[in-house]
A protein has these predicted regions:
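Flexible "stalk/tail and boundary" regions
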Residues: 1-10, 16-17, 26-84, 88-89, ...
Length: 146
């Protein structure tokens, strides 16, 4: 799993049943990993996190081991997690509860984030990214050479 990297944006459309079609480049990587199930949960910035099952198990174990003062965040991540299968047409169903929490209606943006994905409402993603680009760069990035 450590060598698999999902990257790049994909503008997608939710169908009438709340499904997205997994882009071919990601579908091929998932198939090579033997992954046919994903886990979807809430992201603290108003989007959704989508994990291949092996990456989810690692994330889930890390979250579950957090101390009691993080119990609220455990509920956000673990209590909202839903397993979904990638269907024969390479579609992924996003549960209505999770679609509502992230404001997903039609136009969405799937971002490859290394070991997992983020799924954003397209307008919310554009606004969030614009705000990030206007904010000061955090100290942790100031040492990067661009």
């Amino acid at each position: 799993m450590a060598n698999v990297v999902f990257q790049g944006p994909a503008a997608l459309t939710l169908d009438g049943k709340g499904r997205i079609a997994m882009p071919a480049r990601h579908r091929e990587l998932l198939a090579a990993m033997g992954v046919h199930q994903l886990t979807v949960t809430k992201h603290p910035e108003g989007s959704l996190l989508i994990f291949p099952r092996p990456a989810w198990e690692y994330f889930r174990d890390r979250v579950a081991s957090l101390p009691m003062d993080s119990s609220g965040w455990k509920r956000v991540f673990l209590g909202n997690a839903m397993d979904v299968d990638i269907d024969a047409s390479s579609r992924v169903l996003i549960a209505p509860e999770l679609r509502a929490s992230a404001g997903l209606v039609r136009d969405v943006m799937l971002l490859g984030m290394g070991s997992h994905f983020e799924l954003w409402d397209a307008e919310r993603h554009a606004a969030h990214e614009a705000a990030v680009m206007q904010s000061p760069m955090p100290d942790s990035l100031k040492q990067f050479s661009f």
